[in-house]
Amino acid sequence: NFEYLCVDRKKRNMENKPLAERMRPKSLEDYIGQQHLVGPGKVLRKMIDSGVVSSFILWGPPGVGKTTLAMIIAEQLKRPFYVLSAVSSGVKDVREVIQKAEGQRFFNTPNPILFIDEIHRFSKAQQDSLLAAVEKGTVTLIGATTENPSFEVISPLLSRCQVYVLKSQEKKDLEDLIDRAVAKDYYLSKRNITVKEKEAMISYSGGDARKLLNIL
């Protein structure tokens, strides 16, 4: 009975999650779009295959896979993964993560990845607090931003990071995303759904995959 209750609770928790979260890719094989970065022989694919990842910033519009890509990289490389949102985190939060990372080095733990969403919202002081840890390699920073990093990220931090541009999802990728969700999502796949308004949905989403899935 206890096992059944646990499984049932997990199903309810999953059902309560937005479709975009339920369909979040767990590997590059399921990742849609951005082939100029993750396709065979491309820069991020080579970085992952080599197991050596340097700090970088992902710049692109909403819903193009910035957070998902960071999560996949951490998973593929089996790195500890810390997430901070620039909207709700401060210098104290950054320092706490860095202290944890420094403590883990004594246990031969791989350098953690620190993912900062909306890094352009960090103040100069908040960005300054990252510099030493990034320079020493205490953490590998992956920042995500919808704004031009040249204007929003301080020069000393920007000089320590590569910047990779993510593009809006192409129509074919978004069509594939709809088909995959209908076929593979645990709940949608049981309802025999046929999507007749793909064009309208894709147009309304504006190339934002997250928005598209949540419309569905």
Regions found by a protein language model. Name each.
Residues 15-17, 46-84, 100-102, 131-132, ...:
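Walker A/P-loop
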Residues 39-41, 81-113:
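Short glycine-rich substrate-engagement loop in P-loop NTPases that contacts/grips substrate
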Residues 79, 155-168:
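A short helix-turn-beta junction within AAA+ P-loop NTPase domains corresponding to the substrate/partner-engaging
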Residues 178-198:
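Helix-loop-helix "sensor" segment of P-loop NTPases
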